[in-house]
């Protein structure tokens, strides 16, 4: 009888642990649209950031995830999958020459760039994580404006 009780208790513990302690973490997706690209040359680089110290990232090396989107009729869309809920920033680059880097003039970029929550960018209006971030509590879709300087 004691053996049956021990087996029953063990099974009960296993069932409780598997239903409460090992639940799969919920993930979500983020779809990002950009339109009004000045031409259909190259691709669009979509960099996703999830850390305060990741911006600025002028060399595209501090991102959490990065996707490349094809350009169709002056627009591009990608979807980041399996994201944990949290705060994110999206940075886009219209990579017209497909080299994976921002082509620069003397100071300013020659290719289009954009950040979530930004309508314009300038020397006095540089994106930071706190200014450009947004919450992703579940599946979400956003639009990022492309800016040519």
Please give the residue ranges for each predicted region.
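Primarily secretory-pathway and cell-envelope proteins
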Residues: 21-52, 102-149
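Short amphipathic beta-strand segments in non-cytosolic proteins
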Residues: 47-52, 56-67
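Acidic carboxylate motifs that coordinate Ca2+ or other divalent cations, activating on Asp/Glu
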Residues: 99
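Surface-exposed loop/turn motifs at beta-strand-loop junctions within extracellular Ig-like
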Residues: 94-96, 148
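Short proline/glycine- and polar residue-rich coil/turn motifs
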Residues: 68-74, 136
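Bacterial Sec-dependent N-terminal signal peptides
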Residues: 1-29
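A short tyrosine-centered beta-strand micro-motif
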Residues: 86-92
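Short, flexible loop/turn segments at beta-strand junctions in immunoglobulin-like
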Residues: 80-83
